[in-house]
């Protein structure tokens, strides 16, 4: 096996050669996590190796990077215009395709974000294009400082690779520059009207007195805004005052916010609204296609006014329907409040719809990706169910998850009359005998799952037949034929002498306590196993006292 450092170095080298000699740590980490699933459990170590590899590769000249490529036998595979099943073609492709995933850093990503992230990534791969991660943090009151690290980490888990990271709070001077250009072109004005007064005029389709002021006076007002109080002035983009949608009439592009920003402190007081910063960035960053929900249709109209004022060609806009999902908390603000109240244990509480909560339960990113590609970019609304996610995830886990006996709410019993010890070997995976076997030794006392324990004949799977009656477990016979004649119910079991304590955290955060067979001690954190006749679960803590998070049946 190639050492992690060497493997990561190759990914960094490929990324650098593909992108003008500069490797991006986020893109390299995403590529490693996506293509080398066995390394996911080593994410912290891999991240350190990635950072070191990127620094090493970026210190090389383009010629030296090419020499390294030849030495290692690496090649850039051309994938231009390669069709990928499940996604329709993009309209208006004229050259390099550039897309962006642009979350607000109010918290970690949830499964709703996964759709936009995956679709943009899939299209970037489909057309051998570029994907920009743009952190839209121009509302200082809605920024969670931890989100700057959580968002890239969530994308890495999802297997999304990006080529460039842009943080909008680093671009404030750019927004100021284009605000001035817009005012000079007569496309915007500074409005000092009281909000309720302007609303009445807007609803009647009438202009306020600020709209008719010349650009010189508006430029003076603009410069004075930096000393004004919050709420005393805004910049408005001129649109059609008779537009059928009042929300589009002379929309606000800049406003005063007297709040400290987690990254820039009190350096700035005038911040762009989303529609302004998004349109400016999409143009300046060369974004060719914008994928987003149909709830942004009105925003598209707003931004098109800005494009016309500045003489810019708008990107191709592709809108898709809403994604509905029942029985999951997707509200970031609601989740934060619940965490602060102690209702949730954190962003990875199993009741939440965050990607880190889903990952903690053992749901694989490949299952989420497959679902999002299946849903695609259709304009009709879609309903996403846990049942569908579980089905896709099960098809992945069935092939790789090791099997173990787990007795939930266990009852400890002695097998009365057992003639002698019974040694049982069962495969760790029924379809992959090469993985090896696990060994259970029945010596007398066993744990049986409380919910499955009923009076009558039972067969301890692969071991012996017993009769359970009046709280006593009595040996009957050993063969499977006798079990069939008895009509015995199959029941899994854990030898009492070697049992390990374990508990499973369920999706509703309830806890199921039990015991697991001794061979499970070989498991490592992040391993996903099948607890036979109970369900798939991910090992979250190795002990003492193993803790699993339940995925699904």
Swiss-Prot record:
InterPro entries: aa-tRNA-synth_I_CS (IPR001412), Gln/Glu-tRNA_Ligase (IPR050132), Glu-tRNA-synth_arc/euk (IPR004526), Glu/Gln-tRNA-synth (IPR000924), Glu/Gln-tRNA-synth_Ib_cat-dom (IPR020058), Glu/Gln-tRNA-synth_Ib_codon-bd (IPR020059), Rbsml_bL25/Gln-tRNA_synth_N (IPR020056), Ribosomal_bL25/Gln-tRNA_synth (IPR011035). A motif ('HIGH' region) lies at residues 103-113. GO terms for biological process: amide biosynthetic process; glutamyl-tRNA aminoacylation. It catalyses: tRNA(Glu) + L-glutamate + ATP = L-glutamyl-tRNA(Glu) + AMP + diphosphate. Keywords: Aminoacyl-tRNA synthetase, ATP-binding, Cytoplasm, Ligase, Nucleotide-binding, Protein biosynthesis. It comes from the Archaea. CDD domains: GluRS_non_core. Its EC number is 6.1.1.17. One of its GO terms (cellular component) is cytosol. It is found in: Cytoplasm. One of its GO terms (molecular function) is ATP binding. Belongs to the class-I aminoacyl-tRNA synthetase family. Glutamate--tRNA ligase type 2 subfamily. Catalyzes the attachment of glutamate to tRNA(Glu) in a two-step reaction: glutamate is first activated by ATP to form Glu-AMP and then transferred to the acceptor end of tRNA(Glu). PANTHER family: GLUTAMATE--TRNA LIGASE, GLUTAMINE-TRNA LIGASE. This is Glutamate--tRNA ligase. The lineage of its organism: Archaea, Methanobacteriati, Methanobacteriota, Methanomada group, Methanobacteria.
